[in-house]
Amino acid sequence: MCNTPTYCDLGKAAKDVFNKGYGFGMVKIDLRTKSCSGVEFSTSGHAYTDTGKASGNLETKYKVCNYGLTFTQKWNTDNTLGTEISLENKLAEGLKLTLDTIFVPNTGKKSGKLKASYKRDCFSLGSNVDIDFSGPTIYGWAVLAFEGWLAGYQMSFDTAKSKLSQNNFALGYKAADFQLHTHVNDGTEFGGSIYQKVNEKIETSINLAWTAGSNNTRFGIAAKYKLDCRTSLSAKVNNASLIGLGYTQTLRPGVKLTLSALIDGKNFNAGGHKVGLGFELEA
């Protein structure tokens, strides 16, 4: 099993408790389905209640399992077209190669990335290269795992300026029901998170972040409680007195409803609170 996480997935359990089950200030619909020929369709639409702006996207995915190939096409209402071709676990177990391209017909702008990642039980590493003739940017990351401990490094190098534009470190520990994650970004941004699965129904998370040279410390607490196999409640609060509440209900297999609200605790009577509504449909 190649289960070492990527750098971006470090601390993911804590992030999920804070982010999943909420959709403040918008009405959102997600639809996923699969054709008889094996083509996967995914579409989503958002309407923001404060601005009235609406957006949407469509994604199709087709897998050729015998050759380890996956073809993905994307389109959104900004008229941006994306194509992704990936080859996984064929040249070597745990190796994934990807070509990701973007085309904007209105402006003729084209861009792309070459991606490579390699995962094993005790490490994972990867690199992305922008396809830009003026000077590509090279991204790289690596994560080492040993007896539950995780250490990661992430960087980006701007070849046009010949300097590092990103320099991040992370250290964490992962167990079955507990995760600890700390990180330092560019030597100026510091953060950490703790995830605890109390039991089969309750998950909790704590998040802390601050920036060097600033007194602005960000702190938050979040929890998720499963009432039953169909219903869950979510709540979170931060040091800015913003309170988030979420309710998720599986109405029937493949149909999920999410209600959420963001309350400004400092200005409770002044209004400005946000609500959200979401539907997820899968067939």
Curated annotation (Swiss-Prot):
Q: Which reaction does it catalyse?
A: chloride(in) = chloride(out); K(+)(in) = K(+)(out)
- Segments spanning the bilayer are 26-35, 39-47, 54-64, 69-76, 80-89, 95-104, 111-120, 123-130, 137-145, 150-158, 163-175, 178-185, 189-198, 202-211, 218-227, 231-238, 242-251, 254-263, 273-282
The UniProt record lists the keyword RNA-binding? no
Q: Where in the cell is it found?
A: Mitochondrion outer membrane; Membrane
Which terms does the UniProt entry file under GO BP?
sperm mitochondrial sheath assembly; spermatogenesis
* Record-level GO cellular component terms: membrane; mitochondrial outer membrane; pore complex
Give the sites of the cross-link named Glycyl lysine isopeptide (Lys-Gly) (interchain with G-Cter in ubiquitin): 53, 109-110, 266
Which positions bear Phosphoserine?
241
- Keywords from the UniProt entry: Acetylation, Ion transport, Isopeptide bond, Membrane, Mitochondrion, Mitochondrion outer membrane, NAD, Nucleotide-binding, Phosphoprotein, Porin, Transmembrane, Transmembrane beta strand, Transport, Ubl conjugation
Q: What InterPro entries does this protein map onto?
A: Porin_dom_sf, Porin_Euk, Porin_Euk/Tom40
User: Per its UniProt record, what CDD domains does this chain match?
Assistant: Porin3_VDAC (cd07306)
The post-translation modification note in this UniProt entry reads:
Ubiquitinated by PRKN during mitophagy, leading to its degradation and enhancement of mitophagy. Deubiquitinated by USP30.
PTM annotation (Phosphothreonine): residues? 4
The source's domain of life comes to Eukaryota
PTM sites of type N6-acetyllysine: 12, 15, 20, 90, 266
List, in alphabetical order, the Gene Ontology terms for molecular function in this entry. nucleotide binding; porin activity; voltage-gated monoatomic anion channel activity
Instruction: Locate the residues binding NAD(+).
Output: 242-244, 260-264
**N-acetylcysteine found at:** 2
Q: What does this protein do?
A: Non-selective voltage-gated ion channel that mediates the transport of anions and cations through the mitochondrion outer membrane and plasma membrane. Forms a high-conducting channel with a stable open state and a voltage-induced closure with a mild preference for anions over cations. Involved in male fertility and sperm mitochondrial sheath formation.
The entry assigns this protein to a family as follows: Belongs to the eukaryotic mitochondrial porin family.
Subunit text: Interacts with ARMC12 in a TBC1D21-dependent manner. Interacts with MISFA.
User: What does the record's free text say on domains?
Assistant: Consists mainly of a membrane-spanning beta-barrel formed by 19 beta-strands.
Name-wise, this protein is Non-selective voltage-gated ion channel VDAC3
Organism, scientific name: Oryctolagus cuniculus (Rabbit)
Q: What is the name of the gene encoding this protein?
A: VDAC3
